[in-house]
Amino acid sequence: MTSETVIAPSLSTAQNDGTFTYDKVKSTAKERKHLNLKNPSDANEIKSKIWNYYSLSELIQYLGQKENDDFKYKRITLQFPDNLICDSATIVHELQRELNIVPQANQDTGESNTAQRVWILADTSYSACCVDEVAAEHVRSDLVVHFGDACLNEIDKLQAVFVLGKPTLDVDAIVKQIKTAYSTEQKVVLMSDAPHTYLLPEIAKQLPDYDILIADLPKTSRAKIIGYTPPPTGHKKFNRVFNTDTVEFGKYELFHITSPESPRLLQLTTNFASVTTYDPISGTVSTGPFPNLMRRYKYVHQARMAGTVGILVNTLSLANTKVLLNTIKEKIKEAGKKHYIFVVGKPNVAKLANFESVDIWCILGCDHQGIIIDQINEYYKPIVTPYELLLGLSDELSWTGKWVVDYKSVLEEYGNEVIQQNEDPDTDEDLPPVFDPVTGRYVSTSKPLRQINHLMVTSSEQGGVDDHDNQLVKRFSNAVAIKGTVSTSAIHLQNRHWTGLGSDYTEDENAAGALVEDGRKGIARGYDI
């Protein structure tokens, strides 16, 4: 018998430090292009740039206001977009130092306190350009300080302060691009995102021979803009103020500094003679391609034929959101269609694909970033705006080509319109056949609520036990109802070939099922059969 060492069998692959390679953080320095730092590792330079970029002196003076010897704003929330969150820690430290705020643990005892407290909000529930009232209400905030680009829409409840920042621009390069793109006979509107707006007057001064109209920031009732003074009066349009009484925008060329998001860009291209965007980083201009308006006209017709409308709430902070939501619900009901309301945070393809019964989506969101413009058919169902939906539900479909996203304008145009209904809803014979103008097919489910009086809801046994309690959907005469109301989701589930686990067998099959047998035992390396 040999004395060789017995080696136990290896149960897994040998591993050491060289088996796997992990990514390691080589540097903790944060890239802050917006600050134009000469030495990114110099803490003093970073602090000085942050004070100047965000106008912290004016912000601290505003936050330090008092009423009756007490702070006016005690629970302050700071909202940062993703590209500015790197400055949040420094800003909070400076605010705490200047306002004598003592850092506290994130515990709310509910007791009244005369001291100020500061929270940081990041990863907003909806569009980053909107004030996140939902997150602010979690700590019962009485003031939201919004940093970075903002849509400046009227907000619903809370007081807000906008700190847009002071980015730099190569003014001479922009003036050169404008002179190259336009002649002195053309009328030009200068517009930009909110942070770059303070530089527009300087650009206009270098173009004395041009007919230039500047788009200033508007004055809002529940918010203040730090480092910027909006004009008191003017013609308000596109969330901007123009220093004139009336403007025929169709006669103006638009030169926009920075490239807007698709909803904003579509809105601008439908109102100006032409649109040219300028990229401050690369210094290049673009004249297209831009979102197509003809596709929106197709979606209006699809909204007219849709039987089930999903109302997708993509904001809860804008003013008139609840009023518009109630108006849309009433118009959908008057048109004989079914609606469902969804609040899913930030929408994406996977979230909306879970609701197959929805024929079309109507999104309530900010006109800058909160509206989904599906240019590549990424989503399974069309997505329309409230204006497009109400236009499709109206009795006479007449579109002038304008694209309206402002809540107030939509309510003024369609809020008082009454959708006509048949005098006798009990007779289907008077209803004309409906054909889809896109596909040409006959549509029998465009108005499911018109059939509500024909429902014959019956039960297999009154007061007894249902033999088919494993079925989610009960079949009725012509439709499906849940709690006395038509459910198009249940109808859709009923018409599917496969309706879920447990529905793929009938009474004729063996209810006892198969016998349970012993399976394999052991580990994955070797099973005992």
Curated annotation (Swiss-Prot):
The keyword Iron applies. The keyword Transferase does not apply. It holds the Pfam family Diphthamide_syn. Its main location: cytoplasm. InterPro entries: DHP2, DPH1/DPH2, DPH1/DPH2_1, DPH1/DPH2_3. It is found in: Cytoplasm. GO terms for molecular function: 2-(3-amino-3-carboxypropyl)histidine synthase activity; 4 iron, 4 sulfur cluster binding; metal ion binding. Pathway: Protein modification; peptidyl-diphthamide biosynthesis. GO terms for biological process: protein histidyl modification to diphthamide. It comes from the Eukaryota. [4Fe-4S] cluster binds at residues 130, 151, 366. Binds 1 [4Fe-4S] cluster per subunit. The cluster facilitates the reduction of the catalytic iron-sulfur cluster in the DPH1 subunit. GO terms for cellular component: 2-(3-amino-3-carboxypropyl)histidine synthase complex; cytoplasm. Its cofactor is [4Fe-4S] cluster. Keywords: Cytoplasm, Iron, Iron-sulfur, Metal-binding. Belongs to the DPH1/DPH2 family. DPH2 subfamily. Required for the first step of diphthamide biosynthesis, a post-translational modification of histidine which occurs in elongation factor 2. DPH1 and DPH2 transfer a 3-amino-3-carboxypropyl (ACP) group from S-adenosyl-L-methionine (SAM) to a histidine residue, the reaction is assisted by a reduction system comprising DPH3 and a NADH-dependent reductase, predominantly CBR1. Facilitates the reduction of the catalytic iron-sulfur cluster found in the DPH1 subunit. Component of the 2-(3-amino-3-carboxypropyl)histidine synthase complex composed of DPH1, DPH2, DPH3 and a NADH-dependent reductase, predominantly CBR1. This is 2-(3-amino-3-carboxypropyl)histidine synthase subunit 2-2. It comes from Candida albicans (strain SC5314 / ATCC MYA-2876) (Yeast).
